[in-house]
Amino acid sequence: MASDKKAEQSYQDWEKPLFDAWKEKGYFGRTPGFGKNGANTYTIVIPPPNVTGMLHMGHALNDTIQDTCIRRARMQGYQARWILGTDHAGIATQTKVDKKLAEEGISRLEIGREKFIDACWDWREDYGNTIVKQIAGMGCSCDYDDEKFTMSPEYANAVRKVFCDWYHDGLIYKGRRIVNWCPSCTTAIADDEAEYVDEKGHLWYLRYPRSEPVDGMEYGVVATTRPETMLGDTGVAVSPKDERYKHLVGKTIDLPIVGRKIPIFADYYVDSEFGTGCVKTTPAHDPNDYAMGQRNNLEQINVFDEHAVVVEGYGKFSGMTRDEAREAIVAEFEALGLLDHVEDHDHSVMTCYRCHTKLEPWLSEQWFVAVDRLKKRAAEVVENGEIQFHPARWKQVYLDWLENLKDWCISRQLWWGHRIPMFYCDSCGWEDALMEDTDACPKCGGHVHQDEDVLDTWFSSQLWPFATQGWPENPDELKPTYPTQMLSTARDIMGLWVARMVMSSLYFTDQIPFKDVIIHPTVMAADGKPMSKSRGNGVDPLKLMQDYGADGMRFGLLMQVTGAQDLKFNENKLVSSRNFANKVRNAARFVNMNLDGFVPGEPEPKTEADRWMFSRLARLVRSLDAAYDGFEFADVARELYAFFWNEFCDWYIELSKARLSAGGEERAAMQRNLVFVLDTALRLLHPAMPFVTEQIYQELPGEKEAPYLMVASWPDADKLEKYIDPDAEQVITMVTQVVSGIRSIRARYGISPRAELEVVVKAQDDTAASLFESQVQLISTLANTKVSAVSVDAARPDESSVCLADGVEAYVVLSGLVDFDKERARLEKEIGKLEKDFTKFDKKLSNPGFLSKAAPEIVEKDRAKLADITDRLARLRAELAEISQEG
């Protein structure tokens, strides 16, 4: 077996051959079922990463969760398949190719649409598989031989059918609405894809002259964060409850610079406490103004073009960018004596998630999906429990998102993507959505052209669970595998993707797309802040796999998957996981080194230690099944760690050594039991740590149930139930507690392991006394002790230390071994130092000034220090109290 040093230095050297062997055997496709689950399928779909993507920590966490689930299902006998694929990522890919062309000194406008799309396909061929290779490096058992792509011909056909069917059912329509427009990418952007950035800005108070002075006042004052949009103002709004302005409703304003007369009107949207209570209204450049304009029949005037440049008709302002227009218009108001005053004002602005340009609310003609009919059923299947969310709190978040969902803008002004299949006759005005391209009008024979826009990437990805399984062309392929078992994804796309998959699946298949939705935590930096290149706090999973191996990274991440919303990445967990993998490897090495002359056979728990180990193993299987079924992955990792490290490695292996040395049938029985426990435990650990477990499995002797652990059977909790033995658990638990306590006392006082210690035992009753006496020889061997007395009325000797176990108190005699005066002085000195530290940190953390001014991570760090000091003080004071009794 590979040494620990080699394993740490060259994980890929032994991980990749195992992966290649699994792949060559065909284990990554749909595996044949077996056992009681053999007739059932277990299918999951990977959230398709962008074809432009590189593996990041979110992928690493989510792919670990999914692979853990699919590997267990495969071992449970299901016909398991994890569907792999990538998303064409419209705007992301177009941005990448635009950048590549720019480096070559050309633009897409110069080469035209057809050649640009060819360039996108070329880019995908050259770079698009990077993330798939990285997913493979994690050991993910996806179906690599049937990789899907959201722009493949089969998938494109499904997308087209959805558009045509919804169009003909009246669910897709074209409308003139406000959208989030990126002037740099020159396309609409979804609300949920916009990023919000805090900006230190201003609130400009502008004077708008009244057409006819009222009460001697010649102007009204409006407050705005965007003076450049005043060119498109078509009204001034006030609250109908605002007594200051009731008499002005119905009057008009002379819009400065432009000279347009605009009405003063009342609308309940207006907050009379904000600014002056008068709101300039620009229906074409603000969604709230648009809504007020619709309610009050205001004119809609676009003052910017698609590049956010002022359009013609505005004199010297035409041709200016938004920022230039803002500066010039404020200067003009000041020159006219119409700039009342300016205040500092912090607010959030929306930016493009790709290029980070400020988005412009822009009135334009777009294609929309009417969602009211669709979202009703999508809510019902969650409310009635057909789809379950994990953690359960995300159910309400999903329902709230649906309740507030507005019609979905699905058109994008890009070239790379699914082109909208709408066709228009240039002669007679005929138009329709078609499944096949045409250049001739079916009505008049005139020339036909296709819509220039493409569909939102989320429009195509909403079909992912069923379009990847043969729909609509091969419904028989979909039938046995649908709905899929579960979906694991991030919270930020619950609306963008999860809800839309539910809506489209219910419409087109009349079934839910998945039964369970896992919303995994977002991986944050150790300081709790989002990981980002600009902050320099990002973590590269590829580097982590080099340092800790794929298993170390996977298990370390699973240990951190609690029900929390965010996961503060803790690299120490990966260190622990790597050490854990080495512990498992060392335990397996011990077993293998003691298998000379091994004869396979049925395991037989003969001793209390055997019965304890088999019982703990049986309980572990039952417990892991419950944790997996509840998607409690941290519990899975914690219980596996505790069993392997504490029970199997630290105790059962140690308890086995005497019997292995005995020879004969004792040795043979011990060998069979060790192999049985190790083999079963490897199966339980395999989904989380596939490489090291497979490596060890291949080295186990004897005929195997399966050629590879990956397709071996998952332990059956019902079959192992017979091994559960509470009495044996009670006995060995007492043994381990006493031995651990005695060893702790040795370590505390620096007593050599070779020094035999006298122990007096007080039992709580005769049963406990009898139980202890039955294990005296074992305890004495493990702890190097001489038990001088066991009784219910035993007295504690002078100069002794006590360790507690279930049903007994073991008094370890220390006379002649410990200088109690010296030990007491040492403890008092250490306690005094810690008390000073406690006072310092407690005072600091009780100071409101520090709490309000210090960075959150500093406060958190100091709280952790105080908690550690408190814990250490408690332990040292307990030791001092014991010393005082002993001395």
Could you describe each region identified by the protein language model?
Residues T41-T43, G77-I83, A89-G90, K148, ...:
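Beta-sheet entry/capping signal
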